[in-house]
Structure formats: C-alpha cells, structure tokens
Regions:
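Active-site beta-loop-alpha junctions enriched in small/polar residues
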Residues: 11-15, 44-49, 80-84, 103-107, ...
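Short catalytic-loop micro-motif centered on adjacent basic/acidic residues
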Residues: 75-79, 101-102, 175-177
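Active-site groove signature of glycoside hydrolases
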Residues: 32-52
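Distinct, well-ordered alpha-helical segments
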Residues: 1, 20-31, 52-61, 83-96, ...
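Conserved, mostly hydrophobic/aromatic
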Residues: 8, 30, 39-42, 77, ...
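Structured C-terminal cap/extension of enzyme domains
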Residues: 94-96, 115-199
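N-terminal binding-site loop/beta-alpha segment at the start of enzyme catalytic domains
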Residues: 1-6, 64, 70
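Acidic, His- and aromatic-enriched active-site or binding-groove loops in soluble protein domains
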Residues: 65, 97-111, 154-155
Length: 199
C-alpha cells in the first residue's frame, strides 16, 4: 500500500458546474480516478470574484465541502485563490477552512493575496500552500539584469534557490507547490529542500 505513505489532494472546478449536485459528482469522479475512498486535501479551485458570486455562494459549495469533511470523505477542506486581497479576506472569513492555496513569489509580492495573504491565513488558523513559487519557470531562468541584482548581494546561488528561499523564510508558508515536469525536477527540488536553511 501506497495510500498510507502519501497525502492525496484534488480540486473542485466550479466553472463547469451547471447545478449544485455537480459538486458531489465531480468529487466522486476524483475519488474513482485516484483510487481512494478518502481525499486528504480537497479544495474549491480557483476562487475569484465571478466564481464566488455566480457559483460558490449560490450553489452553497462551502456547505457542501464542509459536509464531505463531516462525513469523513475528506480530511481537510480548503480553497485555491486568484483575485484581490479584499476578496481573499472575505473567503477566509466565510468558513472554518483548514487550508488555502495562493500564488506567491518574490516577483508577485503585491499580486492577488500578496504578501499579506499568508499572514491573514495564519491569523485565521489556516495552513498555507503556495503555488507558482518560481512563477511558471520565469524565476528559475532570470534575465541577466535580475540575476545581476541578486548577485550584487554577494550571495551566489541558482535562480530557483532564490525563489524557494524567499518562500521558506515566510513562517506562515506550510508548503511550496512547485510545478515539475520530470523526475529530475522532483529530485532537484528534494535535494535543495533537504539542505535549505533560513536566510
């Protein structure tokens, strides 16, 4: 058994839901595709203003995800977010969420939930996963001018390590979710994570 050695996560796509019952339908499809009865981390995916007002609230998706947790079908209920800080605060305050997933990196310091999002999530007792820590590869292959600015500090390290170090220095970040396209990427990230220290 692999199941007792891994955490499984999946997401609920509000934008393709035509009625409230689609929430449970997509959840059951996820469980079947993964081959598990319980999903550890399940989140309402890509909350933004339009989806919040047109689907999440009217379809009572928060009540539905919390019911899955009560039934033991998921262990942790959360959301991923792509909008402004004001809406982020509203979503955080709307339910007893366990976690959230936001885009954050040193280039997007004030983008979406921004640098204040992690603090707000933690103040509300939530775990925080950060996506796009290397901004879809941009921060892993910096333009020469950006690389020169970083090296002017007297510290010499690969571009990716600058991006990951920035996040690992934010105490509210529980995990950084890095897009990886190969086993070599996975191994490189694991190597660096195993030796990382606070800046």
């Amino acid at each position: 058994g692999w199941r007792d050695r891994v955490y499984v996560t999946s997401k609920s796509p509000w934008w393709i839901m035509e009625n409230p019952g689609d929430f449970e339908k997509f959840f059951d499809e996820s469980r079947r595709a993964i081959g598990t009865d319980v999903i550890d981390f399940y989140h309402i995916h890509m909350i933004m203003h339009r989806g919040w007002k047109e689907k999440v609230l009217p379809f009572r998706l928060i009540d539905r995800i919390m019911k899955l947790k009560e039934q033991g079908k998921i262990r942790f209920a959360g959301f991923s977010f792509h909008d402004r800080l004001q809406l982020f605060k509203e979503v955080v305050e709307s339910a007893p969420w366990d976690f959230c997933l936001i885009q954050h990196n040193y280039l997007d310091y004030e983008y979406e939930a921004g640098c204040l999002g992690p603090k707000y999530a933690a103040a509300n007792g939530m775990g925080l996963a950060v996506m796009k820590p290397v901004r879809t590869g941009f921060l892993a292959n910096l333009p020469a001018s950006m690389r020169a600015a970083l090296r002017s500090t007297g510290v010499e390290k690969p571009d990716t390590e600058w991006a990951l170090d920035y996040l690992w220095d934010i105490p509210e970040v529980s995990v950084a979710v890095s897009g990886m396209g190969s086993m070599a990427d996975v191994e490189a990230n694991l190597r660096y994570a195993s030796k990382a220290e606070p800046n």
